[in-house]
Amino acid sequence: MCGIFSLLNYSTNKIEYTKVSDEFAKGQGRGPENSTLFHDNALNIVTGFHRLAINGLNEVSNQPISVVAGADRYSLICNGEIYNYKQLYKLMDVTPTTDSDCEIIIHLYIRYGIRQTLRMLDGVFAFVLFCPNNIFVARDPYGVRPLYYTKNDEDHNKVNGIIGFTSELKTLCKIANQFNQKVLQFTPGTFLTIDKTIDFERILWLIKEQERYHIPAFASSVNENVNENISSYLEGINYHLRAAVTKRYTTTERPIACLLSGGLDSSLIAAIVCDIHKKQNLAPIETYSIGLPDSEDIKFARMVARHIGSNHTEIIVSEQEMLDIIPEVIQAIESYDTTTVRASIGNYLIGKYIKAHSSAKVIFNGDGSDELAGGYLYMSSCPDSVEYDKETMRLLNDIHLFDVLRSDKSISSHGLEPRTPFLDRGFVNYYLSIPIELR
């Protein structure tokens, strides 16, 4: 897990580097292994990166990553994992200059442009790409990786301001307040182009017009013969989910663990991870569950762990411990939403435990399936399949505000990287292509 930070200053005032450095440091929990902050005095741009190394564990792979092509230099900061980077290098016959999977973004852009680059990436990401004439900002389709930006108050003088991008809301708040700005979520599945040659007022208009590159591929009509292909759909679900887990398992150089609540979602993911892991003849994968004494979740997680043969740890907490940790949780997830805070407490405490007692850095979870597959209890009350489909679309479009925010920040705040196979682009696209009646 990593954290990105960038400020483009269009103010008449110079950026005070020391103050910016203090704010940037607030996001270090996401990337405790290396932090860099660069200030380009000529362009009045600040670029920062907190790194948790998952691939390319050497200093050469630290960010920002720069690539020179002819007379032009391209630089990138990216919080993400690109699962198909090796296949893309082979396709383009390009040799990378680092071992970072994110470097592929630069090479794709140089050859294909930004739109095609975003279509070809299989992964989760939030990045800022600095090119000779433009700056591009983009976020993955479902907002698995967080990204915020500054927005001017409509009544404020538009000429005096900054544009800021960050993985952590807390790193931009004071800076934005100085310029009477708001800090908002960058819309998932979109990108922004900033032309370096145009004025700030025009740039502000462009920021409002983020361009969408991804729209969920929902089934478009009711299928009258839904029962004829049930077995093929089940095979397809199995294939695509296993593929989603496999690519996330193989794209890491750090130890892996799984969250295991005892529910169907996390149990499926943990079972697939264990199945892949056993074929490597390695020690059993670590799984973790948390709950109150005599919790039903703890009991079911124990049963699943025994069945899949994992090295299981149960973290038993009291109600008071859960209440006491709430201020820390709110600080970590950067949300006061009651449901999100409540749901984050367990993940936050597990992340804290793993950081202290395990070498695991990549943490699999079962998040995203309830939104995708209608797992919430109220979904059974949908009047018809069309309304069910509409509600699923709403949940997926908003998932970055709630469950994905929770699953990322409650884990990443401890210097760990969560991985969410149920929100794999290929798996989601396949699942949503299944007739509504079967979903």
Regions found by a protein language model. Give the residues of each.
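N-terminal glutamine amidotransferase
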Residues: 1-77, 81, 111-221, 225, ...
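A generic structural signal for nonpolar/aromatic side chains embedded in well-ordered alpha-helices
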Residues: 24-27, 92, 109, 118, ...
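Short, polar/flexible loop-turn hinges at active-site or ligand-entry regions and domain interfaces
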Residues: 91-97, 112-116, 173-183, 336-339, ...
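Residue-level signal for inorganic ion chemistry
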Residues: 31, 80, 105, 192, ...
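Short histidine
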Residues: 20, 68, 78-131, 259, ...
